[in-house]
């Protein structure tokens, strides 16, 4: 992971990657003091981009005169360690003079309709400061995607508007708010709360839950939703209400005829700590399909799954890389591939991160406990042991749980041995790819050669493939088999493009999706 403090070094990093085909850069902007909410943003950005930049900058222009800039926490070393562990490629942590070399000078002034309501009432100038720094960093990084949290709903609306009005490229991806188990939204400011104050602050999520309950019961009047939230908050001694609003999520204005979704948001103070949270009600997201591709090793699953994901705009989850990551770690710790108990414990403890690659020989980047092991997990020794390691129920159950968490929202493609039969048995489209042993051996030889690795005799490769097939099909837990509702596609005599065209046709016919 690189850490840079200057604009010149950041631009050099970006320019070095710009000419590389397939590079998609993601950006997560933060003010540091990173917590699990930030981690969730970074983790999603890591999955969806080939290169990930995180900025850490306590932006002085978004602090008001009554807000203590010097008091804001700055645990930089801990923040860098979290970024390193999550597989971040570059952290941009500039001093104030680097982003504001001539002082605060030029400013971006967003639409007052978005900034003179809600948080803007008590924080004049705040959103101009936010818009200015976002415009600066977005222009410097030029990301394909930039990730922001739903907790800062007004900030998200402002950023979307500014990026649209100023033609700043990159898609704004809004990620769900992360809450602690007690219900309080994660915030860097939570550290200021005493135990008693935290208990008081829990009235905020309770109040929003009340609004959600009323909505579920048919209430659509914004005034009634606001009244219910205020009632819960007002009943909590020691809590000061700053505002409660029920507005259009994009325009932050009253809804017309009570139609469409509503953003119910509130800001409160507990002691000297200001807290915000919100909930969007009535926003329907139609889940995109899940596509499961199963089959034996060497049938072309990974290549086709990646290309299909690119064509459809889906997220590709490289399940094989996850099992290889566990196998690599087990080999590092000299764990016997037959020791299911130790392997299961290892899988629960190890932290795996995946990202799209930008080299044809290594199309998935892999991190294990913060260390990039993209090449190491493709080593022949790992290939020989991965089937044995993945056969243990404890290993599979943990990785399957992770895969389900990533894919449950839909719009994903997974390939493996048991995706359609076990991981996502209700996937909307299931494909079973197969090919002869002879064809798969030839493909394996070509793959090894492309990676600059030793190529065994073709008969040795055939025997290895037969052995792997036998292991996969005879394991006790979730063995390789064709799902009853899967469509079998033999790839022996077809090019990758021919097979891809057939899969796209199946997607149109079976799911009704557009390509």
UniProtKB/Swiss-Prot annotation:
* This protein's record includes keyword ATP-binding: yes
Q: What positions does the entry give for ATP binding?
A: 31-38, 149-152, 178, 186-189
Q: What is its main location?
A: cytoplasm
Sorted UniProt keywords: ATP-binding, Cytoplasm, Kinase, Ligase, Multifunctional enzyme, Nucleotide-binding, Pantothenate biosynthesis, Transferase
> GO CC terms for this protein?
cytosol
Q: Which residues bind (R)-pantoate?
A: 62, 155
Can you tell which superkingdom this protein's organism belongs to?
Answer: Bacteria
List the protein's name: Bifunctional pantoate ligase/cytidylate kinase
The protein's organism comes out as Gloeobacter violaceus (strain ATCC 29082 / PCC 7421)
């Amino acid at each position: 992971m690189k850490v840079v403090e200057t604009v010149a070094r950041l631009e050099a990093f970006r320019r070095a990657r710009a000419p590389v085909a397939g590079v998609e850069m993601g950006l997560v902007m933060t003010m540091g003091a990173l917590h699990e909410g930030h981690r969730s943003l970074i983790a999603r950005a890591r999955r969806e981009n080939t290169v990930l930049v995180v900025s850490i900058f306590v932006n002085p222009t978004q602090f008001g005169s009554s807000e203590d800039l010097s008091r804001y926490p700055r645990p930089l070393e801990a923040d860098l360690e979290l970024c390193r562990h999550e597989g971040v490629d570059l952290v941009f942590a500039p001093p104030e003079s680097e982003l504001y070399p001539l002082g605060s000078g030029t400013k971006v002034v967003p639409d007052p309709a978005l900034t003179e309501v809600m948080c803007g009432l008590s924080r004049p100038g705040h959103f101009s400061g936010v818009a200015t720094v976002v415009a600066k960093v977005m222009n410097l990084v030029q990301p394909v995607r930039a990730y922001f949290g739903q907790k800062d709903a007004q900030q998200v609306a402002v950023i979307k508007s500014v990026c649209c009005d100023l033609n700043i490229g990159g898609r704004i991806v809004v990620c769900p708010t992360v809450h602690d188990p007690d219900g309080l939204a994660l915030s860097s400011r939570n550290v200021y709360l005493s135990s008693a104050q935290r208990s008081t602050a829990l009235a905020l999520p309770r109040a929003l839950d009340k609004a959600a309950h009323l909505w579920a019961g048919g209430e659509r009047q914004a005034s009634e939703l606001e009244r219910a939230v205020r009632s819960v908050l007002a009943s909590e001694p020691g809590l000061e209400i700053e505002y409660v609003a029920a507005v259009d999520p994009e325009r932050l204005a009253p809804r017309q005829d009570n139609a469409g979704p509503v953003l119910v948001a509130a800001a409160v103070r507990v002691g000297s700590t200001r807290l915000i949270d919100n909930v969007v009600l009535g926003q329907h997201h139609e889940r995109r399909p899940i596509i499961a591709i199963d089959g034996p090793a060497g049938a072309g699953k990974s290549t086709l799954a990646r290309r299909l994901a690119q064509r459809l705009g889906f997220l590709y989850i490289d399940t094989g890389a996850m099992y290889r990551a566990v196998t690599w770690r087990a080999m590092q710790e000299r764990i016997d591939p037959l020791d299911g108990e130790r392997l299961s414990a290892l899988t629960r403890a190890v932290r795996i991160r995946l990202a799209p690659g930008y080299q044809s020989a290594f199309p998935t980047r892999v991190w294990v406990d913060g260390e990039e092991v993209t090449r190491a997990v493709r080593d022949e020794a790992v290939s020989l042991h991965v089937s044995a390691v993945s056969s243990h129920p404890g290993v599979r159950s943990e990785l399957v749980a992770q895969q389900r968490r990533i894919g449950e929202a839909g719009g994903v493609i997974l390939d493996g041995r048991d995706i359609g039969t076990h991981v996502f048995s209700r996937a909307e489209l299931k494909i079973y790819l197969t090919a002869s042993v002879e064809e798969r051996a030839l493909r394996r030889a070509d793959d090894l050669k492309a990676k600059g690795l030793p190529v065994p005799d073709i008969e040795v490769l055939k025997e290895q493939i037969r052995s792997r097939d036998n292991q996969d099909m005879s394991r006790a837990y979730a063995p390789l088999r064709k799902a009853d509702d899967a469509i079998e596609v033999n790839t022996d005599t077809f090019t990758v493009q021919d097979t891809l065209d057939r899969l796209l046709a199946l997607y149109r016919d079976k799911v009704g999706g557009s390509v």
